[in-house]
């Protein structure tokens, strides 16, 4: 879960940067936009899509599965247990890529997520 802890921060800052660069508005409006990207429900949806489309490498999938299956006593607000597990797996992959300094792959995955996000808007 340490990878997910780091990955949560990385994913959050990338989401904030994306919103700040691409949307105008008051801070409260920008925060709401960021929330639609970083919520456990949204992350779970993005991860399901990536799994269905075989976006993850073999190593990333191992990290994802290990994090998803880890016993965790926390629970996300407004998300099911399964959504929370999917989101935790996504965050772990982001943490892994960041710590491996694989910034190109991190950006590639985030761009894929943003493409999915923009299609839903």
Residue map of PLM features:
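Double-stranded RNA-binding/processing signature
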Residues: 1-121
């Amino acid at each position: 879960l340490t990878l997910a802890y780091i990955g949560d921060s990385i994913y959050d800052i990338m989401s904030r940067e994306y919103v700040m660069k691409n949307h105008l508005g008051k801070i409260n409006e920008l925060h709401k936009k960021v929330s639609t990207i970083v919520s456990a429900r949204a992350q779970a949806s993005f991860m399901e899509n990536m799994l269905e489309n075989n976006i993850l490498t073999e190593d990333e999938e191992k990290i994802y599965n290990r994090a998803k299956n880890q016993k965790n006593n926390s629970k996300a607000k407004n998300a099911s247990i399964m959504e929370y597990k999917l989101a935790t797996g996504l965050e772990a992959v982001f943490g892994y890529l960041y710590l491996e300094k694989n910034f190109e792959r991190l950006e590639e995955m985030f761009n894929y997520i943003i493409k999915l996000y923009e299609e839903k808007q």
